[in-house]
């Protein structure tokens, strides 16, 4: 299934409250400052990016709470998509060796159960910017590809991939800019 807009593009953002100057917050204490961002740009968002660490103890219901709060309709009268920036706190070798398998199984089982509510697909963005030296999972393309495929296979076995979207999202520039760390080396395949 493809999620291509009928016309134009999806207007999305990562709108954390800390991105606004204190004088522009209008008294808001909402960590996901969707209303402030929409007021700033003059239109409703089609997609919201929010982050969560990929680690035991974190679960889908935590993200689902954010999703439900901001599920409103966008400017085209359709419900907003949610892009989950999923950040591992371990190395790609640890992920490739299966250290997150139980976490993924539990998480994706929750995701599959939520499909019944039909809030639309979730866009998963796991281990993004893997070609940047600021992440704990950079610098090991071989294990990154193994880890991605391992995670995706678990999602596939639990029926999550047929309805949801998985987004591979490297940084625009590889750092360090070596051939061994080139963006193309991290691509897990179609």
Regions found by a protein language model. Give the residues of each.
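N-terminal module-boundary/linker segments of secreted carbohydrate-active enzymes
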Residues: 1-47, 156-159
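Alpha-helical structural elements
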Residues: 5-6, 45, 139, 161-163, ...
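Short, acidic/polar
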Residues: 22-41, 59-69, 103-109, 178-188
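Aromatic- and acid-rich polysaccharide-binding/catalytic face
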Residues: 43-55, 84, 88, 182-190
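Substrate-binding cleft of extracellular glycoside hydrolase catalytic domains
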Residues: 51-173
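Flexible, glycine-rich surface segments
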Residues: 164, 168-190
